Amino acid sequence: MERRRTSGWEETGDIFIAGIDVGFTGAISFYHHHPDRKRLVMEVYDMPVIKIKKGKKTSQEIDESVLRQIFAAHKLTHVFIEKAQTMSDQGISSAGRYMCGFGILRGICVGMQVPYTLVRPQQWKKIMMSGMSKGKGQSIVRVKQLFPLQDLPLKSDHGKADAILIACYGAKEMGY
């Protein structure tokens, strides 16, 4: 089935690629490149989450409505989603919510007819962090090398940094 958009992005040549670091502390980054102006803009959003109170406990879930609004505000060419994997120290319900969020992201892409690619962390890190340690803090260092004006002041901004690097990896994979 051929995918068509009538919003005008084909005529401008703009490229919009999203990179997503899955999880409640993850983020969504948008790589926007306009070839004629040789301009690159990076936008980054925290993963939209809602807190749900169940008795005395509070849990988090991805806010699908806000996520869809964020996607709809960008005329996406392609989305690169970090392939979710549960960790051995994660509890069952935490792992379930994490994987549910991963499924929501894929479902929104399918529902909005935006092509997506799942990318293992080792894949994008090998390309984007070549010659560097692959620790969480290192992705912030790498983003600051590539985008000196990008503001990532907190150690907890590693999700944003990962999303930016995933979007850049996606752009490289697509030849931009």
What are these regions (language model features)?
Residues 1-176:
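Phosphate- and other anionic-substrate recognition elements at nucleic-acid/protein interfaces
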